[in-house]
């Protein structure tokens, strides 16, 4: 197995990712007041060649002190977006990345 820190690059923090965490925390800060899901979900940036089982093993190895168990992993490849650089004179692209939405069993969380 690869080094777990080569597979999991970092925690992904956006409004949608935080909304997923709040839904699993049961704080009711989702789209509908009082909405929640049973299992905690977190979003991570992962390596492009990472597979779902490899992501699950890496997270369980990184958070071995919290004794987490991964229930499921969903992955999304985000395509590079067009961008302009140097005051709009040159065209380029942002770098694409792969993100993983990881669902943990109820009672197990990394947060």
Swiss-Prot record:
Keyword Nucleus: no
Keyword RNA-binding: yes
Classification via InterPro entries: Nucleotide-bd_a/b_plait_sf (IPR012677), Ribosomal_uL23-like (IPR013025), Ribosomal_uL23/eL15/eS24_sf (IPR012678)
Keyword tags: Ribonucleoprotein, Ribosomal protein, RNA-binding, rRNA-binding
Gene Ontology MF term list: rRNA binding; structural constituent of ribosome
Coiled-coil parts of chain: none
Segments crossing the lipid bilayer: none
SUPFAM superfamilies: Ribosomal proteins S24e, L23 and L15e (SSF54189)
A single Gene Ontology CC term: ribonucleoprotein complex
GO biological process: translation
Similarity comment text for this entry: Belongs to the universal ribosomal protein uL23 family.
NCBIfam families: PRK05738.2-2 (NF004362)
Oligomeric and partner information: Part of the 50S ribosomal subunit. Contacts protein L29, and trigger factor when it is bound to the ribosome.
Role description: One of the early assembly proteins it binds 23S rRNA. One of the proteins that surrounds the polypeptide exit tunnel on the outside of the ribosome. Forms the main docking site for trigger factor binding to the ribosome.
Stated name of the protein: Large ribosomal subunit protein uL23
The species this protein was found in: Chlamydia pneumoniae (Chlamydophila pneumoniae)
Gene of this entry: rplW
């Amino acid at each position: 197995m690869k080094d777990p820190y080569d597979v999991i690059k970092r925690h992904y923090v956006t409004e949608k990712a935080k909304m997923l965490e709040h839904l699993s925390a049961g704080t009711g800060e989702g789209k509908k007041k009082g909405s929640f899901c049973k299992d905690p979900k977190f979003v991570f940036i992962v390596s492009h060649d990472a597979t779902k089982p490899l992501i699950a093993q890496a997270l369980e190895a990184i958070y071995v002190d919290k004794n987490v168990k991964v229930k499921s992993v969903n992955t999304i490849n985000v395509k590079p977006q067009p961008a302009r650089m140097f005051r709009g004179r040159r065209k380029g692209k942002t770098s694409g990345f792969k993100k993983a939405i990881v669902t943990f069993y109820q009672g197990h969380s990394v947060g």
